[in-house]
Amino acid sequence: MKLWGGRFKEEESKLMEDFNSSLSFDKKLYYEDIKGSIAHVKMLTNQNIIKEEEKEKILLGLEEILKEIDEGILKIEGDYEDIHSFVEINLINKIGNVGKKLHTGRSRNDQVALDMKLYAKKSTEEVIECLKELMDSLIKVGNENNYIMPGYTHLQRAQVVTFRYHLLAYFEMFKRDEKRLENALEILNESPLGSGALAGSTYNIDKEYTAKLLGFRKPVDNFLDGVSDRDYIIELISKFSIIMMHLSRLSEELILWSSSEFRFIQIGDAYSTGSSIMPQKKNPDGAELIRGKIGRVYGDLISILTVMKSLPLAYNKDMQEDKEPFFDAKDTVISCLKVMEGIISTLKVNKENLMKSVKKGFLNATEAADYLVNKGMAFRDAHKVIGEVVIYCEDKNSAIEDLSLEELKQFSDLFCEDIYEFIDYKNSINKGIKKEMGYF
């Protein structure tokens, strides 16, 4: 049974039926589809479009279908065109002809637009919750490991920071991601139900009622836009892509830091794997997979952008292709956030190796230049002097703080005994605006 066919003389080919069907993936929307239908039926009764007793039968049937799906009694499978057909046909089979009144004053166009918006809202809230859990772990692990470490530019050791402060940089990234998603929720929070196929309905549909009942801020203002808007899907996948980019940056650093060349951290066994041939190997596969899965989400974004390119108003069947990219992007970003939270919450930090790397990289060179500036030298001249000091140290295989005062005075008479206190790593990180890094 189809929800259409009266104007056709010939049957749809089996090839076209299979090609046209979306049940295999839009079955994810069963909950939203049934909840939308419940709201629609209540509105139809309020507007005296269907009778009270008809409403009760339809509602009971819909609730039974929802319960049977949730309990695994009713399988979402079979020769149905989509989830809307599945629900409506099963409703008719369950309660009889009164079920045929469910779709009064509604099109699958505004129905699927509603389903996707409800699903997008729920999915976005899930992603926000995962972001919050990861941010909490970043703060907790950072506070537990507030150790001095090298900060990098160009992947070269640059200046002293702390492990805590480094993690807090990612906290800020994910905090922006959270704000972006909250803003997206506000924009998409308009109900398309009542838009019909593209031009509303001759029935006195109360779209404000259904919008409120379903938790939307308001109904859409334009019917054509209501059924054809997929901006929110593009926007959300775009924001998911930014989250994945942030996760990939963090993953890359964790992979580097856990390597034998760095040994800054140890990723827990629970988020590592081994080798089938090399017994000694402990691979950071969790972080590597997160880094790799960014390609999926970027691909999902390009997919939906391409689907929507040049589409005329209003609904077009191309829009059926909006679902799989969104479902995939949402599932991917949630799984990656959860795995990253697990990696962060269980990693171990090697305080000693962090400090060893600090001492090998002339990370107090900028502070040494600042010292000369405080003694009256212009910064550009101080920069040149300390550059020469670094060359001298490299030739001696020494650190700036290990040079004698006599050696330092070869480069400038401004050097005094207090230079050593000034360029001490623990002291320098608590000077000036550096205090904001919160080393304690």
Curated annotation (Swiss-Prot):
A GO molecular function annotation here is:
argininosuccinate lyase activity
Family of this protein: Belongs to the lyase 1 family. Argininosuccinate lyase subfamily.
Q: Read off the Pfam families from this record.
A: ASL_C2, Lyase_1
Q: Tell me which species this is from.
A: Clostridium botulinum (strain Hall / ATCC 3502 / NCTC 13319 / Type A)
Q: What protein name is recorded for this chain?
A: Argininosuccinate lyase
**Source taxon at top rank:** Bacteria
Subcellular localization(s) per the UniProt record: Cytoplasm
PANTHER family, A to Z:
ARGININOSUCCINATE LYASE (PTHR43814:SF1)
GO biological process per UniProt: arginine biosynthetic process via ornithine; L-arginine biosynthetic process
Q: What is its EC number?
A: 4.3.2.1
Keywords on record: Amino-acid biosynthesis, Arginine biosynthesis, Cytoplasm, Lyase
**Gene Ontology CC, one term:** cytosol
Q: Where are the transmembrane segments?
A: none
The record lists the catalysed reaction(s) as: 2-(N(omega)-L-arginino)succinate = fumarate + L-arginine
Looking at its record, which EC class is this enzyme? lyase
Q: In which pathway does it act?
A: Amino-acid biosynthesis; L-arginine biosynthesis; L-arginine from L-ornithine and carbamoyl phosphate: step 3/3
